[in-house]
Curated annotation (Swiss-Prot):
It holds the Pfam family ATP-cone. InterPro entries: ATP-cone_dom, NrdR-like_N, RNR_NrdR-like. Coiled coil: none annotated. A zinc finger (unnamed) spans 3-34. GO terms for molecular function: ATP binding; DNA binding; zinc ion binding. Keywords: ATP-binding, DNA-binding, Metal-binding, Nucleotide-binding, Repressor, Transcription, Transcription regulation, Zinc, Zinc-finger. Disulfide bonds: none annotated. Residues 49-139 form the ATP-cone domain. This is Transcriptional repressor NrdR. Binds 1 zinc ion. It comes from the Bacteria. GO terms for biological process: negative regulation of DNA-templated transcription. Belongs to the NrdR family.
Length: 158
């Protein structure tokens, strides 16, 4: 594994343990050249997924892009990073175990919103504003109403 600080390939594993309920191996590493310490994660990849964008373009699924999107929504929110990582792993497992070689960007966004709804309301609203392409203040009001209805268990069809 290459050191992220000095790019040396001379690194050693100092600690290795299961994480995320055994779905991931967390390794603590140290660089023999610069002494830098860093953590890596090893996880099973069931299949190579292709994402079908709204434009019809196909690109390889990028777990890191999903992670960055969710982290942007969670910025400055007091949420346990382990909980976020479990949510991201859950989304990826759902996508991989669906048995499809392709998944739409809309499906990924919907799964991310579902996960965020259970983690943090503010992050859910932030993510929704980008995913649903909000253009007016009423769009925010509508998603807040959705959250309020789902939290109280009210049914709009009365």
């Amino acid at each position: 594994m290459r050191c992220p600080y000095c790019q040396s390939e001379d690194t050693q594993v100092k600690d290795s343990r299961p994480a995320e309920d055994g779905a991931v191996i967390r390794r603590r590493r140290v660089c023999s050249v610069c002494g830098g310490r860093f953590t890596t994660f090893e996880r099973v990849q069931l299949r190579d997924l292709m994402v079908v964008k709204k434009s019809g373009r196909r690109v390889p699924f990028d777990r890191d892009k999903l992670t960055r999107s969710i982290e942007v929504a969670l910025r400055k929110r007091d949420v346990d990073s382990e909980r976020v990582e479990r949510a991201i792993s859950g989304i990826v497992r759902q996508l991989e175990s669906a048995g499809e070689a392709e998944v739409t960007s809309d499906e990924i966004g919907r799964l991310a919103m579902d996960a965020l709804k259970g983690i943090d309301d503010i992050a859910y609203i932030r993510f929704a504003s980008v995913y649903r392409n909000f253009s007016k203040a009423v769009d925010f009001h509508n998603v807040i109403d959705e959250l309020t209805v789902s939290e109280t268990g009210d049914n709009l069809e009365t």
